């Protein structure tokens, strides 16, 4: 009943789509956008089956953007205006930094339970012939019990990142959390390697979980700082589309992180995934410094 009552007095709210036209016209616009998503999703699934993930994803993204550009009708001028963000170099720098923060947060949310289940769900056992083999860990920690803690901390601390950024500047906060994530990623990878090859992986679980929570906290704070930076760097017309674009690209972290983690765990080298993430975070350090913190930065400390 409260949900129905909530509709009364809300006729002053604007619709999501400005000037939607007739119901048939509005439905056509929505159907067209969904159609683009469906076609590119099909193409992406096919591309992923025949080529490397690092090629399939960019192809899918470029195809989606290209098809959106071809949508006819009165929606086209609005899309064209939004596409102006791609000529701004800060769109690309902030895309990289948003992958660092939001992409890591959403990616680790999927990768953490996978890591707990596979790395700590099994253990090494010495056979009668002296050979090592992986067997089920009878006292394995449950992913359902522990995996929620990381995303919870990251989501809870995000507003703190925005508040600190208002005081210090978003880029300084982003730089600090980038350093934290580089160090924590390397440390987590090392602990994962020890646990994966141990006859007692449970002895490493507490440290493993703490390090992951540190990365979640850093990515949550960084999510607040990069959000603040986008609002500072871009004008009123561009910051909305930029935020939508960076969020959409960073959301691929939910696919990439667990996939990379799963591949490396299957290969017996889970630490390689974390070391790879650490390299990316180091690149983000350089990007953030070059664009926003060096002496002659394009925009100083947004």
Walk through the language-model features, giving the residues of each.
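Juxtamembrane cytosolic amphipathic helices that cap and anchor the N-termini
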Residues: 22-37, 84-101, 204
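C-terminal membrane-cytosol helix-exit motif in multi-pass small-molecule transporters
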Residues: 1-19, 34-76, 285-292
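Multi-pass alpha-helical transporter architecture, strongest
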Residues: 6, 10, 191-192, 276-302
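Extracytoplasmic gate region of multi-pass secondary transporters
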Residues: 37-56, 88-155
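Interfacial helix-cap and linker-helix signal at transmembrane-aqueous boundaries
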Residues: 47, 116-117, 164-165, 260-269
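C-terminal transmembrane helical hairpin of 12-TM major facilitator-type secondary transporters
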Residues: 142, 171-225
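A late C-terminal transmembrane helix in Major Facilitator Superfamily
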Residues: 233-269
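Helix-to-loop junctions at the C-terminal end of transmembrane segments
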Residues: 157-170, 265
């Amino acid at each position: 009943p409260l949900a129905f009552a909530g509709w009364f007095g809300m006729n002053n709210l604007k619709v999501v789509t400005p000037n939607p036209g007739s119901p048939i016209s509005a439905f056509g616009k929505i159907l067209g956008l969904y159609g683009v998503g469906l076609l590119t999703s099909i193409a992406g699934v096919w591309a992923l089956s025949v080529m490397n993930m690092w090629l399939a994803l960019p192809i899918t993204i470029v195809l989606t953007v290209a098809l959106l550009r071809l949508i006819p009708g009165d929606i086209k001028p609005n899309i064209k205006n939004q596409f102006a963000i791609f000529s701004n170099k800060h769109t690309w720098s902030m895309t990289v930094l948003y992958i660092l923060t939001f992409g890591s947060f959403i990616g680790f949310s999927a990768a953490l339970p996978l890591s707990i289940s596979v790395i700590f769900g099994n253990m090494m056992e010495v056979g009668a012939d002296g050979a090592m083999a992986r067997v089920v860990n009878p006292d394995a920690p449950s992913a359902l019990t522990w995996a929620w803690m990381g995303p919870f901390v990251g989501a809870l601390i995000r507003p703190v990142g925005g508040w600190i950024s208002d005081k210090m500047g978003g880029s300084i906060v982003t730089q600090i959390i980038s350093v934290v994530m580089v160090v924590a990623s390397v440390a987590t990878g090392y602990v994962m390697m020890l646990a994966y090859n141990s006859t007692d992986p449970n002895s490493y679980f507490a440290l493993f979980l703490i390090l992951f929570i540190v990365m979640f906290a850093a990515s949550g704070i960084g999510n607040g700082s990069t959000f603040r930076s986008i609002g500072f760097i871009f004008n009123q017309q561009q910051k909305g589309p930029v935020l939508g674009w960076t969020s959409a690209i960073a959301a691929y972290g939910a696919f990439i992180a667990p996939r990379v983690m799963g591949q490396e765990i299957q290969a017996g080298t889970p630490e390689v995934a974390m070391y790879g993430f650490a390299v990316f975070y180091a690149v983000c350090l350089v990007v953030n410094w070059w664009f926003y913190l060096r002496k002659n930065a394009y925009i100083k400390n947004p």
